[in-house]
Amino acid sequence: MALQSEEKLEVGYSSLQPKTRKWVLLMLRVLAFFATAAATVVMGLNKETKTLVVATVGSTPIKASLAAKFQHTPAFVFFVIANGLASIHNLVMIMGDLFGQKLDYKGLRLAMIAILDMMTVALVSGGVSAAAFMAELGKNGNSHARWNKICDKFETFCDHGGGALIASFAGLILMLIISVMSIIKLLIKPKPDSTIVVP
């Protein structure tokens, strides 16, 4: 049974040459970095101010300037923090792949990378899920709880938030693939060298 599972592992990602595997993983990390960084920047700069009529006294409208900012919603703040941390994680892993090949302590490097990748997937998943829930609430409201929708008044704010969500979901999918590849890399045992060197 164990032999069959090892054979299955050797068919996909592991059947690639080690150098090709390294570059595939590196390119996925670069794409994930750009996706999560874009989500962080777009949501972090998301703000819209509008002047709306809030009441009418006689025939005179009373206007007020209202602002929609990502800081007003804790779920969006968590989204920015989660994607920012994922961007930093990916940047550190890219630097480690390029320059840190000799930084391995008793073979723990691959295990730590796999654990950190899984933690990052969980963090981004939580952030994007919370933000998606609040975005849906802002778009459609909730008539049972008497929460009004705001996207009919702050269209640009909602459009930018939607773009940030798309980028973050793309980053999450890439991070899931990276996490699977890290675990496979951890499980694959290097094949023993069959050449014998005689001194």
From Swiss-Prot:
Source organism's superkingdom? Eukaryota
Q: Which residues lie on this side of the membrane: Cytoplasmic?
A: 1-22, 96-112, 185-199
Residue ranges annotated as Extracellular topological domain: 44-74, 134-163
- Fetch the InterPro entries from UniProt: CASP/CASPL (IPR006459), CASP_dom (IPR006702), CASPL (IPR044173)
Q: Does the keyword Transmembrane helix apply?
A: yes
Q: Does the keyword Cell membrane apply?
A: yes
Tell me the compartments it is located in. Answer: Cell membrane
Membrane-traversing stretches = 23-43, 75-95, 113-133, 164-184
Keyword set, alphabetical order: Cell membrane, Membrane, Transmembrane, Transmembrane helix
Regarding the membrane, this protein is recorded as: Multi-pass membrane protein
User: Gene Ontology cellular component?
Assistant: plasma membrane
* Subunit organization: Homodimer and heterodimers.
Question: Know the name of this protein?
Answer: CASP-like protein 1B2
Task: Say which species the protein is native to.
Answer: Populus trichocarpa (Western balsam poplar)
Q: Species lineage, top-down?
A: Eukaryota, Viridiplantae, Streptophyta, Embryophyta, Tracheophyta
